[in-house]
Regions:
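A short glycine-rich, Lys/Arg-flanked "PGG" loop and its adjoining helix->strand segment in the class I
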Residues: 193-208
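Feature marks short, surface-exposed loop/turn motifs that line or immediately flank catalytic pockets
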Residues: 139, 217-219, 266-267
Length: 326
């Protein structure tokens, strides 16, 4: 790769990068490479091509269904599990989502997909006004239809707004929300710093920004070559470490309270399957709900504490919640 072909999406460096992985899952062109910037150590795809149409047409989930054989019903089931866990995480991290002026707290879930998190918030935190901002009308319609057909009071239809978090949206909603969430969104965009800054600009004073991403230092990378190969995929432009997430947040938000913790999404049986068979579980990967409680929680807690889990959670509480300092 010639140096003129590379530009780091975080620091702008153009020196020849270090090759991390030559093949990228789902790359039909064969031209994408996973590389590491030698100036700032960020790992990204090169060239960092963002395809909005992929998400508007629900191509990401379509690939999972077609490539791994995972039924859409399982995607929905796992999304519901993740949503409940994420709602619980506010209390775990000391976020009450209660305003001092007596008005309902407001939450915006950016890139909320089918709306499972928005639905869980509506059901479990009816005192909070929650909205899902989703760029794909197709996904919002699919989610709405799923909740309506399900007819389950535990899964109400969330409030959707179809659109992008662009400068126009920020101008209309600046300082309007008490919490903004991006669950596995940041890795998909070609300017993650700008997206973080726009998201923070929506926060009221005292508000908080919640970002979850896959973990570059997932320990399973070193235990299953197939898992490592699969984890570099064409829709994920960036691959973040805990250290990089913290550096990004401190660069954007001087004086902010910044917390980066590990979070384990998939269960121990999925972990063992990758190690033993060097392959995914396929149609029903283990998400772990209530079985194997002691074993699962002990293993999960250890990975999260070491930040070698499969995901990372960044929580930022900017000073004055005014957004970017750059």
């Amino acid at each position: 790769m010639a140096s003129e072909d590379f530009r780091c999406i975080l620091c702008g460096g153009t020196d020849r990068p270090h090759l991390v992985q030559e093949q990228v899952t789902g790359d039909a062109s064969g031209k994408l490479r996973a590389v590491q910037c030698l100036a700032c150590a960020h790992v990204q795809l090169s060239p960092p091509a963002y395809d909005l149409g992929l998400y508007q047409e629900d191509g990401q989930v379509g690939f999972v269904i077609g490539h791994y054989g995972t039924p859409i019903e399982t995607v929905f089931e796992h999304s519901a599990i993740e949503a409940r866990r994420r709602v619980a995480r506010f209390a775990e991290h000391g976020e009450a989502l209660v305003r001092s002026d007596g008005q309902p707290a407001r939450l915006l879930d950016i890139g909320g997909g089918y709306g499972f998190f928005g639905s869980a918030m509506t059901r479990l935190r009816p005192d909070v006004e929650s909205c899902v901002l989703e760029p794909s009308a197709s996904r919002a319609e699919t989610g709405t239809r799923h909740f309506e057909e399900r007819g389950d009071p535990d899964f109400p239809v969330p409030r959707f707004e179809v659109g992008l978090l662009d400068e126009d949206y920020v101008a209309r909603h600046r300082r309007s929300y008490d919490a903004v969430t991006l669950w596995h969104v940041l890795e998909h965009v070609d300017d993650p710093l700008a997206l973080m800054a726009r998201a923070a600009a929506l926060l009221r004073p005292g508000g908080s920004l919640w970002i979850e991403v896959p973990n570059l230092h997932d320990e399973l990378f070193g235990l299953s070559p197939a898992y490592r190969r699969r984890s570099y995929m064409h829709e994920h432009i960036s691959y973040f470490s805990a250290e990089m997430l913290e550096r990004m947040a401190r660069r954007l938000f001087a004086g902010a309270d910044v917390e980066v913790t590990g979070y384990q999404r998939y269960g121990i049986f999925n972990y063992f399957h990758w190690i033993e068979h060097n392959a995914p579980q396929g149609a029903r990967p283990d998400m772990w709900e209530r079985d194997r409680w002691w074993l699962e929680t002990s293993w999960r807690s250890a990975r999260e504490a070491a930040r070698t889990s499969d995901a990372l959670l960044l929580v930022v509480r900017p000073v004055g919640a005014q957004g970017s300092q750059t």
